[in-house]
Amino acid sequence: MTGKTLYDKLWDAHVVRTEPDGTALLYIDRHLVHEVTSPQAFEGLRLAGRKPWRTDTVLAVPDHNVPTTHRDQGISDPVSRIQVETLDANVHEFGITFFPMNDVRQGIVHVIGPEQGATLPGMTVVCGDSHTSTHGAFGALAFGIGTSEVEHVLATQCLLQKKMKNMLVSVDGRVGPGVTAKDIVLAIIGEIGTAGGTGYAIEFGGEAIRDLSMEGRMTVCNMAIEAGARAGMVAVDETTIEYVKGRTYAPTGEQWESAVAAWRELNSDADARFDRVVRLDATAIAPQVSWGTSPEMVVPVTGRVPDPAEATDPVKASGMKRALEYMGLAANTPIEQIAIDKVFIGSCTNSRIEDLRAAAAVVRGRKVAGNVKLAMVVPGSGLVKQQAEQEGLDQVFLEAGFEWREPGCSMCLAMNADRLEPGERCASTSNRNFEGRQGQGGRTHLVSPAMAAAAAVTGHFTDVRQLAQS
């Protein structure tokens, strides 16, 4: 009998029943909720006279619409305020655990879940948010769902799903200095494209992935969706177990021992078969910078803006031309000659303590360049912010000329007060560089925290490896 992949094991453990058409009813272990995709779901429960099936599995937090400055003054934008107030009212009515805006535990939903130990190995985890794939870093099956599905999970604790195919992305060897998890995942997306993972659950493996901390693995799994896959995951190992141990929602005592024994089985069998295998050489990966309006439009910082004339596919060439026009770039421009206007260090991709430490290491003793209008650091949660302040990282950023903000999704998306103006160019540690993502007419370049910090202090994209040597 052929061995099972990690995805197969997680899927099989949660199937309640399988329909004749192959669709399966999956049991959901953890449901994370935020203010944007939940209002209609709660209203649906209310209209049907239903209660949530298991309130103990649900954790709610406002993150998309919350301000990152002057929280004592409340939320000024009326739409944002209504969404946050509606979540507040709904969780109180239905008895759901909630971290409100001014709670130190508040933060981005994909940061606080793992931080609290609400995300555990072997779980099925859903949220009305496409970057739920983040939680797959724990050897969990995690994926985003729509608002109608949010209501369905609240009401039944189950979800109808079609099984995906299996893909293995193995990053073999070890990365060099200055190359991070963000660079690894951008290189993967550059290799397979934004549709490369469509229809698959991606397992990330290889020595370079095993070498990553849990923060790094979360960064990689976070952007599985940018590769087209609804779910990304990493096998459980000692790194996973050590991260989870002692967290608020983690099991304790005998339950911990039995849980760990089960978690150690959460890896793909040696004879498991994948529908597709992609291999990358970790030693060949350099710090990455996106140049266009799709995460697959990415090159090493040492490279140049690609020329559409060299593309063999006319459709791709047309897309490249449009991207260059929107981004205000010329083909063959060296990446290191591109000047920036703003820097954003944050988002569910790169706002954890490891990310802030990496950025601070570059910033320490330097100043934000004169041409940079705004450089901001937005911790992923109140607890990350608290820890960073205990380590003095806030002072490193403030002394350099950065703004030190309150936790939230912030400038990852133009859904709050933090956004780009038309034509402004931003070095961003977020996950999407679509047209208008950070503000109408805004130009987004995706980079790692260290690369964002390097751009902030030089005023243009800079190979952080060279900066480290100086």
From Swiss-Prot:
- Enumerate the catalysed reactions: (2R,3S)-3-isopropylmalate = (2S)-2-isopropylmalate
Biological pathway? Amino-acid biosynthesis; L-leucine biosynthesis; L-leucine from 3-methyl-2-oxobutanoate: step 2/4
> Cofactor: bound how, per the entry note?
Binds 1 [4Fe-4S] cluster per subunit.
Q: Which UniProt keywords apply?
A: 4Fe-4S, Amino-acid biosynthesis, Branched-chain amino acid biosynthesis, Iron, Iron-sulfur, Leucine biosynthesis, Lyase, Metal-binding
Q: Which cofactor does it need?
A: [4Fe-4S] cluster
What molecular function terms (GO) are annotated for this protein?
3-isopropylmalate dehydratase activity; 4 iron, 4 sulfur cluster binding; metal ion binding
Enzyme Commission identifier(s): 4.2.1.33
Q: Where do the annotations place [4Fe-4S] cluster binding?
A: 348, 409, 412
Q: Biological process GO annotation list?
A: L-leucine biosynthetic process
Q: Where is the signal peptide?
A: none
Please report a single Pfam family linked to this protein: Aconitase
The record's listing under InterPro entries reads: 3-IsopropMal_deHydase_lsu, Acnase/IPM_dHydase_lsu_aba_1/3, Acoase/IPM_deHydtase_lsu_aba, Aconitase_4Fe-4S_BS, Aconitase_4Fe-4S_dom, IPM_dehydratase_rel_enz, IPMI_cat
**According to its UniProt entry, what is the function of this protein?**
Catalyzes the isomerization between 2-isopropylmalate and 3-isopropylmalate, via the formation of 2-isopropylmaleate.
Stated family: Belongs to the aconitase/IPM isomerase family. LeuC type 1 subfamily.
Quaternary structure (record): Heterodimer of LeuC and LeuD.
Could you identify this protein by its name? 3-isopropylmalate dehydratase large subunit
Q: From which lineage does this chain's organism come?
A: Bacteria, Pseudomonadati, Pseudomonadota, Gammaproteobacteria, Chromatiales
